[in-house]
Swiss-Prot record:
It comes from the Eukaryota. One of its GO terms (molecular function) is toxin activity. Disulfide bonds: none annotated. This is Short cationic peptide-1g. The keyword Ribonucleoprotein does not apply.
Amino acid sequence: GFGSLFKFL
């Protein structure tokens, strides 16, 4: 989900 993307950033 988007949460994972933010974590990656």
